[in-house]
Amino acid sequence: MPVVTGRLRDPDINPCLSESDASTRCLDENNYDKERCSTYFLKYKNCRKFWHSIMMQRRRNGVKPCMPTAAERDEILRAMGKMPY
């Protein structure tokens, strides 16, 4: 597996791994009809936007690492009480 692909599959680096997998699975099941999978694409897009804003906020505040680990992300989502995307 190439290094870039390995990084994208790492849950500590990619916060939207489950959304990405769901959209790919939807495409596979629906013969790559993108219109049928638009809700999955939208959820993935919102996930990326949400975690990007968290990452930028942490970077501005000087928190390292900029992207929270998978465990930290679980705590953030639990504290919010619901999925923001």
UniProtKB/Swiss-Prot annotation:
Gene Ontology cellular-component annotations: mitochondrial intermembrane space
Subunit structure, as described in the record: Monomer.
Recorded family membership: Belongs to the CHCHD7 family.
SS bonds (residue pairs): 16-47, 26-37
Gene name in the database record: CHCHD7
Localization of this protein: Mitochondrion intermembrane space
Domain CHCH: 13-55
Positions of short motif Cx9C motif 2: 37-47
Sequence motif Cx9C motif 1, location on chain: 16-26
Protein name listed in UniProt: Coiled-coil-helix-coiled-coil-helix domain-containing protein 7
